From Swiss-Prot:
EC number: 1.2.1.8
Protein source organism: Burkholderia pseudomallei (strain K96243)
Name of the protein: Betaine aldehyde dehydrogenase
Transmembrane segments: none
Source organism phylogeny: Bacteria, Pseudomonadati, Pseudomonadota, Betaproteobacteria, Burkholderiales
Modified residues (Cysteine sulfenic acid (-SOH)): 285
């Protein structure tokens, strides 16, 4: 018997049965309890979703921008009214502490919808004079039907981040949440419908990567926005291009450097490093997992980090005092433990954690102790590859040039940060770091106003910020001739 029963698709403004005959299960990562059995979409279901999205998008785009803005603002109100209930659902599905899901997941999703609701009326074109008798004007028009493919670490936040700019610009979206955390996207769909979004404008299709592939290759979809791993992102991008040259936004993985210089406030630096590695049990794409520390302050910094790690409160996600929960799935647990074993085998010095937690109530959950490795080398797997778990690697350095060169020696380029009291060095270093999201003397905040996305293999395009609206519209140029037409022949 599951907690939430059978979960269906959401198409054309209502829950709908899938036609595949297939289902998959989703579990509470803290207890192993069966949360729900979820119907998997078929190719026919994806076709249904696209057809309803096309119909709904025509109605949605025909509304005035102010009408769309008001409806999106109503969705924001409903999200905030139901914050606690949605936070509990997200806690059960992801394993995150309730204190975190109440304060972050729904709140930041609602903030982004509110932000784009305010910008919906600001989508405008340009007027370009050519000569006294002729001018050009441009229109920013919606793309049509967009697909959003989410990751399992921030299910409802990602659904909001992808749908908000799409809907604000007059598009429809078909969203596929991760099969690991599939529940909250359905609640967002219900809220959009209740707020007045026309049927079909936000559909949810459930399933594994095969459903994502169907969306990526579908000729009726104009854009795909994907959040997930690099290799899967490359497959999505390939399908999107080969099928119909779709627009793409890719928010992919990272192996982000945090550089602590010898003039840094070490207490502040330790606070930043611990947050940048252990928030959400390390399951954050922007985590600063490569911590470069200037040699002169390394020992003092490590001492402060370990003191803070010892204060982390690992526990049941439902306990308001817990600030560190389980990993999201058994597969992720095995992956993280494999990397920890690799770090030990390659000679990294284990300073904290390094094992699965199995005592008391941890036994049935996917818990790994917050882990810190010292004296790491750049060639170690734990330093080179994205782990997506609570594993910090500390790497000593001598000079600024050395730190920058080593920080940039990666195929990733999602995030980076520096901690220093020297303003000139802070900006100089940040300008040399090859990353799309950077922080000085802080880490992790990604407000609605801030464009986020990666360099190199960490992504294409941006989410959030004004610039993202450009990625959900296309420009139509119109020349107007007021004078006599001059024939060529």
């Amino acid at each position: 018997m599951s907690v939430y029963g059978l979960q269906r698709l959401y198409i054309a403004g209502a829950h709908a049965d899938a036609t595949s005959g297939k289902t998959f299960d989703t579990f509470d990562p803290a207890t192993g309890e069966l949360l729900a059995r979820v119907q998997q979409a078929s190719a026919d279901d994806v076709d249904r979703a696209v057809a309803s999205a096309r119909e709904g998008q025509r109605e949605w785009a025909a509304m005035t921008a102010m009408q769309r803005s008001r409806i999106l603002r109503r969705a924001v109100e409903l999200l905030r009214e139901r914050n606690d209930a949605l936070a509990e659902l997200e806690m059960r599905d992801t394993g995150k502490p309730i204190a975190e899901t109440r304060a972050v997941d729904i709140v930041t999703g609602a903030d982004v919808i509110e932000y784009y609701a305010g910008l919906a009326t600001a989508i405008e074109g340009l007027q370009v004079p050519l000569r006294p008798e002729s001018f050009v004007y441009t229109r920013r028009e919606p793309l049509g039907v967009c697909a959003g493919i989410g990751a399992w670490n921030y299910p409802i936040q990602i659904a909001c981040w992808k749908s908000a700019p799409a809907l604000a610009a007059g598009n429809a979206m078909i969203f596929k949440p991760s099969e690991v955390t599939p529940l909250s996207a359905l609640k967002l769909a219900e809220i959009y419908t209740e707020a007045g979004v026309p049927a079909g404008v936000f559909n949810v299709v459930q399933g594994d990567g095969s459903v994502g592939a169907l969306l990526s290759a579908h000729p009726g979809i104009a854009k795909v926005s994907f959040t997930g791993g690099v290799e899967t992102g490359k497959k999505v991008m390939s399908l999107a291009g080969a099928s119909s040259l779709k627009e793409v936004t890719m928010e992919l993985g990272g192996k982000s450097p945090l550089i602590v210089f010898d003039d840094a406030d070490l207490d502040r630096a330790a606070d930043i490093a611990v947050t940048a590695n252990f928030f959400s049990a390390g399951q954050v794409c922007t985590n600063g997992t490569r911590v470069f520390v200037q040699q002169a302050v390394k020992d003092a910094f490590v001492e402060r980090v370990l003191a803070r790690v010892a204060r982390i409160r690992v526990g049941k996600p439902s306990d308001p005092d817990t600030n560190f929960g389980p990993l999201a799935s058994a597969a992720q647990l095995d992956k993280v433990l494999g990397y920890i074993d690799s770090g030990k085998a390659e000679g990294a010095k284990l300073l904290a954690g390094g094992a699965r937690l199995v005592n008391d109530h941890f036994a049935s959950g996917q818990y790994v102790a917050p882990t810190v490795f010292g004296d790491c080398r750049d060639d170690m797997r734990i330093v080179r590859e994205e782990i997506f778990g609570p594993v910090m690697s500390i790497l000593p350095f001598e000079t600024e040039d050395e730190a920058i060169a080593r920080a940039n020696a990666t195929d990733y380029g999602l995030a980076a940060g520096v901690v220093t009291e020297n303003l000139s060095r802070a900006h100089r270093a940040i300008h040399r770091l090859e990353a799309g999201i950077c922080w000085i003397n802080t880490w992790g905040e990604s407000p609605a106003e801030m464009p986020v996305g990666g360099y190199k293999q960490s992504g294409v395009g941006r989410e959030n910020g004004i610039t993202t609206l450009e990625h959900y519209t296309r420009i139509k140029s119109v020349q107007v001739e007021l004078g006599r037409y001059q024939p060529v022949f």
